Protein backbone atom coordinates (compact mmCIF):
# COMPACT_ATOMS: atom_id res chain seq x y z
CA UNK A 1 0.00 0.00 0.00
CA UNK A 2 1.35 3.40 -0.90
CA UNK A 3 1.89 6.12 1.64
CA UNK A 4 -0.98 8.11 0.22
CA UNK A 5 -3.21 5.11 0.82
CA UNK A 6 -2.34 4.45 4.43
CA UNK A 7 -3.94 7.12 6.59
CA UNK A 8 -4.36 6.79 10.34
CA UNK A 9 -7.63 4.91 10.12
CA UNK A 10 -7.77 1.24 9.07
CA UNK A 11 -8.72 0.69 5.46
CA UNK A 12 -11.67 -1.52 6.41
CA UNK A 13 -13.32 1.39 8.19
CA UNK A 14 -12.93 3.59 5.12
CA UNK A 15 -14.48 1.18 2.64
CA UNK A 16 -18.03 1.04 1.33
CA UNK A 17 -19.75 -1.79 -0.49
CA UNK A 18 -21.97 -0.42 -3.27
CA UNK A 19 -24.77 -2.80 -4.27
CA UNK A 20 -27.42 -2.62 -6.95
CA UNK A 21 -25.18 -1.11 -9.62
CA UNK A 22 -26.33 -0.78 -13.20
CA UNK A 23 -24.48 -3.19 -15.46
CA UNK A 24 -23.44 -0.11 -17.42
CA UNK A 25 -21.62 1.42 -14.45
CA UNK A 26 -17.83 1.50 -14.79
CA UNK A 27 -15.03 2.19 -12.34
CA UNK A 28 -14.91 5.70 -13.75
CA UNK A 29 -18.60 6.52 -13.37
CA UNK A 30 -18.66 5.02 -9.87
CA UNK A 31 -15.66 7.13 -8.92
CA UNK A 32 -17.14 10.25 -10.49
CA UNK A 33 -20.20 9.95 -8.28
CA UNK A 34 -18.69 9.04 -4.93
CA UNK A 35 -15.69 11.35 -5.06
CA UNK A 36 -18.15 14.19 -4.50
CA UNK A 37 -17.91 13.32 -0.79
CA UNK A 38 -14.16 12.91 -0.47
CA UNK A 39 -10.90 11.60 -1.85
CA UNK A 40 -11.10 8.01 -3.07
CA UNK A 41 -8.03 5.84 -2.58
CA UNK A 42 -9.65 2.94 -4.44
CA UNK A 43 -12.73 2.36 -6.57
CA UNK A 44 -13.69 -0.83 -8.37
CA UNK A 45 -16.71 -2.44 -10.02
CA UNK A 46 -16.53 -6.19 -9.49
CA UNK A 47 -16.62 -8.18 -12.72
CA UNK A 48 -16.85 -11.80 -13.75
CA UNK A 49 -13.26 -12.89 -14.40
CA UNK A 50 -14.25 -14.73 -17.57
CA UNK A 51 -16.93 -12.61 -19.24
CA UNK A 52 -15.78 -9.30 -17.69
CA UNK A 53 -19.45 -8.50 -17.16
CA UNK A 54 -20.28 -6.42 -14.09
CA UNK A 55 -21.51 -8.41 -11.13
CA UNK A 56 -23.70 -5.52 -10.04
CA UNK A 57 -21.67 -4.35 -7.06
CA UNK A 58 -18.40 -2.66 -6.24
CA UNK A 59 -16.32 -1.02 -3.54
CA UNK A 60 -15.16 2.53 -2.91
CA UNK A 61 -12.50 3.39 -0.33
CA UNK A 62 -12.17 6.90 1.05
CA UNK A 63 -9.12 8.55 2.57
CA UNK A 64 -10.90 9.11 5.90
CA UNK A 65 -13.81 7.70 7.88
CA UNK A 66 -15.26 11.20 8.01
CA UNK A 67 -15.68 11.09 4.23
CA UNK A 68 -17.39 7.71 4.48
CA UNK A 69 -19.81 9.18 7.00
CA UNK A 70 -20.47 12.11 4.67
CA UNK A 71 -21.27 9.75 1.80
CA UNK A 72 -23.62 7.69 3.96
CA UNK A 73 -25.34 10.82 5.24
CA UNK A 74 -26.00 11.80 1.61
CA UNK A 75 -28.18 8.75 0.91
CA UNK A 76 -29.99 7.92 -1.30
CA UNK A 77 -27.40 7.69 -4.07
CA UNK A 78 -28.13 7.36 -7.77
CA UNK A 79 -25.37 6.23 -10.14
CA UNK A 80 -25.95 6.10 -13.90
CA UNK A 81 -29.65 6.63 -13.34
CA UNK A 82 -30.04 3.79 -10.85
CA UNK A 83 -30.52 4.03 -7.09
CA UNK A 84 -27.71 2.04 -5.46
CA UNK A 85 -27.27 0.63 -1.97
CA UNK A 86 -24.12 1.69 -0.12
CA UNK A 87 -23.16 -0.18 3.04
CA UNK A 88 -20.08 -0.33 5.21
CA UNK A 89 -17.94 -3.12 3.81
CA UNK A 90 -17.71 -6.21 5.99
CA UNK A 91 -14.27 -7.66 6.68
CA UNK A 92 -13.28 -11.15 5.63
CA UNK A 93 -13.46 -12.39 9.20
CA UNK A 94 -16.80 -10.78 9.97
CA UNK A 95 -18.37 -11.95 6.72
CA UNK A 96 -18.40 -15.50 8.08
CA UNK A 97 -20.92 -14.59 10.74
CA UNK A 98 -24.53 -15.45 10.00
CA UNK A 99 -26.53 -12.38 9.15
CA UNK A 100 -23.47 -10.26 8.41
CA UNK A 101 -25.16 -9.01 5.24
CA UNK A 102 -28.54 -8.30 6.83
CA UNK A 103 -29.79 -4.76 7.29
CA UNK A 104 -30.87 -4.36 10.92
CA UNK A 105 -31.31 -1.48 13.35
CA UNK A 106 -30.72 -3.36 16.61
CA UNK A 107 -27.51 -4.51 18.28
CA UNK A 108 -26.85 -7.10 20.96
CA UNK A 109 -24.38 -5.90 23.61
CA UNK A 110 -22.83 -8.72 25.65
CA UNK A 111 -20.51 -8.87 28.61
CA UNK A 112 -21.80 -5.77 30.36
CA UNK A 113 -21.39 -5.54 34.13
CA UNK A 114 -24.20 -5.65 36.65
CA UNK A 115 -23.78 -2.01 37.61
CA UNK A 116 -24.26 -0.87 34.01
CA UNK A 117 -27.35 1.28 33.60
CA UNK A 118 -29.22 2.55 30.57
CA UNK A 119 -27.42 5.90 30.70
CA UNK A 120 -24.04 4.19 30.37
CA UNK A 121 -25.16 2.52 27.16
CA UNK A 122 -26.74 5.70 25.86
CA UNK A 123 -23.69 7.83 26.63
CA UNK A 124 -21.47 5.49 24.64
CA UNK A 125 -23.62 4.43 21.69
CA UNK A 126 -25.30 7.74 20.87
CA UNK A 127 -22.08 8.82 19.16
CA UNK A 128 -23.03 6.40 16.37
CA UNK A 129 -26.54 7.69 15.73
CA UNK A 130 -29.98 8.36 17.13
CA UNK A 131 -31.04 5.71 19.67
CA UNK A 132 -34.68 4.67 19.80
CA UNK A 133 -34.75 1.99 22.51
CA UNK A 134 -32.35 0.52 25.08
CA UNK A 135 -33.24 -2.77 26.78
CA UNK A 136 -31.09 -4.19 29.58
CA UNK A 137 -32.20 -7.79 29.97
CA UNK A 138 -33.09 -9.13 33.41
CA UNK A 139 -34.12 -12.49 34.79
CA UNK A 140 -37.89 -12.67 34.95
CA UNK A 141 -37.85 -14.47 38.26
CA UNK A 142 -35.16 -12.75 40.29
CA UNK A 143 -34.95 -9.45 38.43
CA UNK A 144 -31.18 -9.83 38.30
CA UNK A 145 -29.44 -8.37 35.28
CA UNK A 146 -28.30 -11.03 32.85
CA UNK A 147 -25.21 -9.31 31.49
CA UNK A 148 -26.46 -8.22 28.09
CA UNK A 149 -28.65 -5.62 26.44
CA UNK A 150 -30.19 -4.57 23.14
CA UNK A 151 -29.91 -1.11 21.61
CA UNK A 152 -32.14 -0.05 18.70
CA UNK A 153 -31.21 2.81 16.37
CA UNK A 154 -33.19 4.73 13.78
CA UNK A 155 -30.76 3.89 10.96
CA UNK A 156 -29.10 0.60 9.99
CA UNK A 157 -25.89 2.45 9.16
CA UNK A 158 -25.40 3.16 12.87
CA UNK A 159 -25.41 -0.59 13.47
CA UNK A 160 -23.11 -1.28 10.52
CA UNK A 161 -20.65 1.31 11.77
CA UNK A 162 -20.67 -0.15 15.28
CA UNK A 163 -20.16 -3.79 14.34
CA UNK A 164 -17.11 -3.16 12.15
CA UNK A 165 -15.39 -1.62 15.19
CA UNK A 166 -13.58 -4.37 17.05
CA UNK A 167 -13.57 -2.93 20.55
CA UNK A 168 -16.22 -1.16 22.60
CA UNK A 169 -15.95 0.03 26.21
CA UNK A 170 -19.13 0.67 28.20
CA UNK A 171 -19.01 1.77 31.84
CA UNK A 172 -15.29 1.11 31.94
CA UNK A 173 -15.54 -2.49 30.72
CA UNK A 174 -14.98 -4.08 27.34
CA UNK A 175 -18.07 -5.56 25.77
CA UNK A 176 -18.90 -7.44 22.61
CA UNK A 177 -21.35 -6.15 20.04
CA UNK A 178 -23.23 -8.05 17.33
CA UNK A 179 -26.19 -7.42 15.09
CA UNK A 180 -29.36 -8.56 16.83
CA UNK A 181 -31.26 -10.98 14.64
CA UNK A 182 -34.81 -12.17 15.15
CA UNK A 183 -35.85 -15.73 14.35
CA UNK A 184 -36.92 -14.85 10.84
CA UNK A 185 -33.66 -13.04 10.14
CA UNK A 186 -31.65 -15.99 11.40
CA UNK A 187 -33.60 -18.27 9.09
CA UNK A 188 -32.99 -15.81 6.28
CA UNK A 189 -29.28 -15.79 7.05
CA UNK A 190 -29.32 -19.56 6.93
CA UNK A 191 -31.03 -19.86 3.57
CA UNK A 192 -29.92 -16.81 1.64
CA UNK A 193 -26.20 -17.38 2.10
CA UNK A 194 -26.31 -20.55 0.04
CA UNK A 195 -26.31 -18.87 -3.33
CA UNK A 196 -26.02 -15.15 -3.01
CA UNK A 197 -24.21 -14.68 -6.32
CA UNK A 198 -22.20 -11.81 -5.03
CA UNK A 199 -25.00 -9.52 -3.93
CA UNK A 200 -23.87 -9.21 -0.33
CA UNK A 201 -21.57 -6.64 1.18
CA UNK A 202 -18.91 -9.21 1.95
CA UNK A 203 -15.73 -8.08 0.40
CA UNK A 204 -12.46 -6.89 1.68
CA UNK A 205 -10.64 -6.38 -1.56
CA UNK A 206 -10.76 -6.24 -5.28
CA UNK A 207 -11.26 -9.85 -6.03
CA UNK A 208 -14.05 -11.91 -4.77
CA UNK A 209 -16.73 -10.27 -2.77
CA UNK A 210 -18.93 -12.92 -1.27
CA UNK A 211 -20.44 -14.13 -4.47
CA UNK A 212 -19.95 -17.12 -6.56
CA UNK A 213 -21.65 -20.38 -7.13
CA UNK A 214 -23.26 -21.89 -4.07
CA UNK A 215 -21.09 -20.23 -1.47
CA UNK A 216 -21.62 -21.36 2.05
CA UNK A 217 -22.64 -24.65 0.63
CA UNK A 218 -25.53 -26.96 1.06
CA UNK A 219 -23.71 -29.34 3.30
CA UNK A 220 -24.70 -27.80 6.59
CA UNK A 221 -22.94 -24.47 6.67
CA UNK A 222 -25.41 -22.29 8.53
CA UNK A 223 -28.28 -24.37 7.21
CA UNK A 224 -30.12 -27.36 8.56
CA UNK A 225 -28.06 -29.65 10.73
CA UNK A 226 -28.14 -27.48 13.79
CA UNK A 227 -26.50 -24.46 12.27
CA UNK A 228 -27.19 -20.92 13.30
CA UNK A 229 -30.88 -20.45 12.62
CA UNK A 230 -31.16 -24.07 11.57
CA UNK A 231 -34.13 -26.28 11.14
CA UNK A 232 -35.28 -27.52 14.51
CA UNK A 233 -35.34 -24.56 16.81
CA UNK A 234 -35.49 -21.82 14.26
CA UNK A 235 -32.92 -19.81 16.12
CA UNK A 236 -33.64 -16.36 17.36
CA UNK A 237 -32.73 -14.20 20.28
CA UNK A 238 -34.77 -15.40 23.22
CA UNK A 239 -36.65 -18.39 21.82
CA UNK A 240 -39.60 -18.01 24.16
CA UNK A 241 -39.32 -14.30 24.56
CA UNK A 242 -37.19 -14.10 27.65
CA UNK A 243 -33.87 -12.95 26.36
CA UNK A 244 -30.81 -14.36 24.75
CA UNK A 245 -30.69 -17.93 25.92
CA UNK A 246 -33.22 -19.59 23.65
CA UNK A 247 -31.11 -19.96 20.55
CA UNK A 248 -32.53 -23.17 19.30
CA UNK A 249 -34.96 -24.40 21.90
CA UNK A 250 -33.20 -27.76 21.77
CA UNK A 251 -29.67 -26.42 21.96
CA UNK A 252 -28.95 -27.24 18.36
CA UNK A 253 -28.45 -23.71 17.14
CA UNK A 254 -25.58 -21.58 18.27
CA UNK A 255 -24.12 -24.23 20.50
CA UNK A 256 -20.76 -23.79 21.98
CA UNK A 257 -18.33 -24.74 24.64
CA UNK A 258 -19.65 -22.53 27.36
CA UNK A 259 -19.65 -19.03 26.02
CA UNK A 260 -20.69 -16.87 23.12
CA UNK A 261 -17.40 -16.25 21.38
CA UNK A 262 -15.62 -16.14 24.72
CA UNK A 263 -17.11 -12.93 25.98
CA UNK A 264 -19.86 -13.97 28.32
CA UNK A 265 -20.95 -17.11 30.09
CA UNK A 266 -24.57 -16.88 29.10
CA UNK A 267 -24.99 -20.63 29.23
CA UNK A 268 -25.16 -20.55 33.00
CA UNK A 269 -28.69 -19.29 32.59
CA UNK A 270 -29.93 -22.01 30.33
CA UNK A 271 -29.09 -25.41 29.00
CA UNK A 272 -30.08 -24.22 25.55
CA UNK A 273 -26.74 -22.55 25.16
CA UNK A 274 -24.82 -25.76 25.62
CA UNK A 275 -23.00 -28.05 23.21
CA UNK A 276 -24.49 -28.53 19.81
CA UNK A 277 -26.44 -31.60 18.89
CA UNK A 278 -26.14 -30.83 15.24
CA UNK A 279 -22.55 -31.64 14.50
CA UNK A 280 -19.99 -29.32 13.06
CA UNK A 281 -20.05 -25.66 12.25
CA UNK A 282 -19.61 -25.20 8.55
CA UNK A 283 -20.25 -28.81 7.62
CA UNK A 284 -17.33 -30.52 5.99
CA UNK A 285 -14.90 -27.70 5.52
CA UNK A 286 -14.30 -26.39 9.00
CA UNK A 287 -13.73 -27.41 12.56
CA UNK A 288 -16.20 -27.91 15.39
CA UNK A 289 -18.75 -25.21 16.02
CA UNK A 290 -18.29 -24.51 19.67
CA UNK A 291 -15.69 -24.87 22.32
CA UNK A 292 -13.23 -22.23 23.27
CA UNK A 293 -14.58 -19.57 20.98
CA UNK A 294 -14.42 -21.57 17.77
CA UNK A 295 -17.81 -20.32 16.62
CA UNK A 296 -16.30 -17.57 14.56
CA UNK A 297 -13.25 -19.51 13.48
CA UNK A 298 -12.29 -19.20 9.85
CA UNK A 299 -13.19 -22.21 7.72
CA UNK A 300 -10.22 -24.17 6.49
CA UNK A 301 -9.53 -24.17 2.79
CA UNK A 302 -10.88 -20.69 2.53
CA UNK A 303 -10.48 -19.43 -0.99
CA UNK A 304 -11.62 -16.75 -3.28
CA UNK A 305 -12.65 -14.19 -0.73
CA UNK A 306 -11.27 -10.78 -1.59
CA UNK A 307 -8.75 -12.20 -3.97
CA UNK A 308 -8.68 -12.56 -7.70
CA UNK A 309 -9.81 -16.16 -7.76
CA UNK A 310 -12.59 -16.93 -10.13
CA UNK A 311 -14.39 -19.17 -7.68
CA UNK A 312 -15.13 -16.33 -5.26
CA UNK A 313 -16.57 -18.75 -2.78
CA UNK A 314 -15.47 -20.22 0.49
CA UNK A 315 -13.66 -23.50 0.42
CA UNK A 316 -11.37 -22.98 -2.56
CA UNK A 317 -14.15 -23.56 -4.99
CA UNK A 318 -15.55 -26.61 -3.26
CA UNK A 319 -19.23 -27.13 -3.86
CA UNK A 320 -21.41 -28.91 -1.38
UniProtKB/Swiss-Prot annotation:
Gene3D superfamilies reported for this sequence: 3.30.70.330
GO terms for MF: DNA binding; DNA/DNA annealing activity; G-rich strand telomeric DNA binding; miRNA binding; mRNA 3'-UTR binding; mRNA binding; pre-mRNA binding; protein domain specific binding
Region (Nuclear targeting sequence): 268-305
A GO BP annotation: import into nucleus
Omega-N-methylarginine found at: 194, 206, 218, 225, 232, 284, 300, 318
PTM annotation (N6-acetyllysine): residues: 3, 298
Name this polypeptide is given: Heterogeneous nuclear ribonucleoprotein A1
Organism of provenance: Rattus norvegicus (Rat)
Gene coding for it: Hnrnpa1
Amino acid sequence: MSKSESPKEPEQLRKLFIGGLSFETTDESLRSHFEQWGTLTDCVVMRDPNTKRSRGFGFVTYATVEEVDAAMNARPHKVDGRVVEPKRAVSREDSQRPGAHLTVKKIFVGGIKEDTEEHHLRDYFEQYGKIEVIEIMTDRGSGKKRGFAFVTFDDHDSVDKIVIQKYHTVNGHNCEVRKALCKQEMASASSSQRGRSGSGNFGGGRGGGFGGNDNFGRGGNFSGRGGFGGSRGGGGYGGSGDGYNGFGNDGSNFGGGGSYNDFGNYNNQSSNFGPMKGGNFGGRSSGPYGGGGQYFAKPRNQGGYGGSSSSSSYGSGRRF
